Amino acid sequence: TGSGSCIPTNTQQNSTFLSQSFYDDDGVKLELENQTIIDKFNSITGIEQRKYINKDLNTSDIATIAAQDAIEDAQIDPETLNYIIVAHNFGDIPYGSKQIDTLPNLSARVKSKLKIKNPSCVAYDILFGCPGWIEGMIQAKAFIKAGMAKKCLVIGADALSRVIDKYDRDSMIFADGAGATILEASDESGGIISHTSATYTSENEADFIYYGNSCNTKVDQSKK
């Protein structure tokens, strides 16, 4: 019944990466000119720019902004929310740090920032990779269908600029942002028609999202 978003204002054009040094997975510096790398990247992805959050913001901040937007759009009292579900992957990471902060969970931080006092408004996180928000929607729908909830707030948020390896050319893919949706019980027909979920962990699939070392072996790998 309502949706909201937070799109950062700090725009990074592809040209931002012209002076960056890129390395491969073996730590060898790429010999291609950066303009060639950028042009090929653009031809494959179509990406010309990405948005990064400002230094004074964090993932829970942009999640809250998106949530406020969705609440206003739905015109509901936030105290009537039964669940707040936040899908993310890396929690809060202050600018200049690589330390992941997930305790208290981001959903609790969002609830606090929204000044919701109702203890029956249950707030929890899910770490589910890229489709985390979709899985959050599936869970919210299940709560409503089971009669366990009437109103749910589902948020997807990440500040990937805080965790990317700037020496990896794939870092140009990632950006920051948050989106939020209000789901409400209704007597009318409609809603999510069908869905399915899956988790693949065979061979090395469990490590597809792995916070590893920098491609540049000359930098301090102890700092995350």
What are these regions (language model features)?
Residues K145-A178:
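Flexible, glycine-rich active-site loops centered on histidine and acidic residues
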Residues A66-N82:
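Phosphate/pyrophosphate-binding loops at sites that engage ATP/ADP/AMP, CoA/4′-phosphopantetheine
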Residues N34-S60, I93-K151:
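Conserved catalytic cysteine-centered active-site region
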Residues F41, E79-V86, C121-D125, K150-A157, ...:
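Beta-strand segments within the central parallel beta-sheet cores of soluble alpha/beta enzyme folds
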